[in-house]
Amino acid sequence: LGTYPLAVCGASMAESDSQAYFLPFSAKWGSDNVRVGAPLLPFTLAKLRSGSKVGALIDAANDQDFIRDVAWAMGENKTIEAQDGKVVFSAGPDWVPVPEDATIRAVGGEQSNVSIIIDERIMLKIYRRLRAGTQPELEIARFLTEVARYPNTPEFLGALEYVTDTGEHTALAIAFSFVENQGDAWTALVDGLDRSLEDLTLRQDKKATVESDLERLYTFPLDLAARLGKRTGEMHRAFATPTDDPAFASEPISEDDISKWAQTLRDESDRVLGELEKRMVSLPEAARHHVATLLGVREALNDRIAAIAATAPLGIKTRIHGDYHLGQVLVSKDDVIIIDFEGEPRRSLAERREKSSPLRDVAGMLRSIDYVASAAVDRFATRKGELPDQVVAVATAWRNRANRDFLSAYLDAVQRTQIC
């Protein structure tokens, strides 16, 4: 792309397949770029020299000029010839033109990809780990934006892909509309519940009931759970939008589906319990106790999985989020925005694109809500050095109430459908 080489770097692992990573390069000439304290020094890969000139070779994902060029190329639907294929920039119908003086800023936090905000209107996500094949996030973003018109996810704006001469696609980057937000729902709920538990211990009314504590302390977190249930149900209705596209057309759940899902559960259960059993002797005593308890119910787990395998098929399977938890939800004013449709990172692209029961997403979110209560209680105990029974009781009641509110709102949103 202009003067920026778009490189793919390979990494070979001793016990796994080789991996490919997208690493665009940018050359920054001038001694100021290699001095101690240079702004781009943390992203410098090597020192450059050409005659008397010196400079830095940096990761171009951190070069504002490169980001502007990527945005320009998307808007122009530019194609660049490449080895054994081509690099294709494409803009969706809602593409937002980027001015030359557009502001560029990176999104902080631990991420496996690079997220950049352009002109406070576009969020550019550059994929680091590359996988050949259709990227679920890319096709889902297009479907939800252009077909289902689902409003509670960022609009798809554009994409950057490498397309081989044989037609195989590899997603390099994707652009969405930028949504102003107050952070993710996980942080909002854990922080809110933690503050509420702290307030509980400071109150003089020690005889307050658990239910009154919930009503007086947790209005915001409880409202958020109901709103999230509603938006989740609407997302699943969007995925069930009638379409001729075989990648998104809903299908009846079959006996083979039930059998396959049950076998996947069985395999994962055996793998996890087997690993725990092997490592048990090296665990701390407290952890060994919990592992022993879990291993003691292995037969009950197998019985539960067998019951699932015997369940009669009911409802439809559709595309789903696939990695649904509170960290994938942004709090935006008094609403929620659902993001990150890449699917579970440890699964192949083909597995992530498989249709499944929408209730898989529901189960993932209920588990995430349960984790909120545990995280808030753990944070309280670490800070205080003690854990009053009232604190545990209120956190547990919050979890139960949040789950009920989420499920009630979800079921209201999907009523009169074949989703469940």
What are these model-predicted stretches?
Residues 1:
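Short, Gly/Pro- and small/polar-rich lid/capping loops
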Residues 4-281, 321, 326-420:
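Conserved ATP-binding subdomain of kinase catalytic cores across diverse folds
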Residues 89-102, 272-318:
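An alpha-helical support segment within catalytic cores of ATP-dependent transferases
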